[in-house]
Amino acid sequence: MKVRLGGRRGTLILAVGLMAGLILGAGASARAERSHPLVKLETSMGDITLELYPDKAPVTVANFLEYVKAGFFNGTIFHRVISTFMIQGGGLDAQMNKKPTRAPIKNEADNGLTNDAYTVAMARTGDPNSATAQFFISTVNNTFLNHTAKTPQGWGYAVFGKVVKGKEVVDKIKAVPTATKGMHENVPVEPVTIVKATVVQN
């Protein structure tokens, strides 16, 4: 059956239909954005909210959320702070004791995400597939950490989210005075604690 749209009335109907389509499209886009998990880090210097990307880093996000839900990060500190590089935490308590973790996960740094300022990525050793619980938030664009090749030198560091709220808190943390404590360098003089980590949207 053919539908004829003629004259002013037809134009109006067509315009309304197009507008409705745009609104529905925008709503679908907003829902897609809201579907990303959100994690709030309540720190001793303020709250930081992270948006995670399970579509880009499914293994990494699932691993991080497991630690959050288990309360693993509660009471840990940002133990390594370099203002022109990153703030790292999620593995040590205020006495610099390393918490026991689950098994390491595979490196998903080849997911196309880059280590830009305010992104969150997994910390690891020289072994590309050694990340467990520790993570870092970049304070600058750290392009040298990006994936370039599937080699020990080129694997890079897996980005799995970004700061969507509390960038000013990250800026405050990166500016704290640091010192060497035992074998650890760049440790905040006054502990910066992750009081609690919670999933605010799953």
Residue map of PLM features:
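Cyclophilin-like peptidyl-prolyl cis-trans isomerases
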Residues: 2-7, 13-202
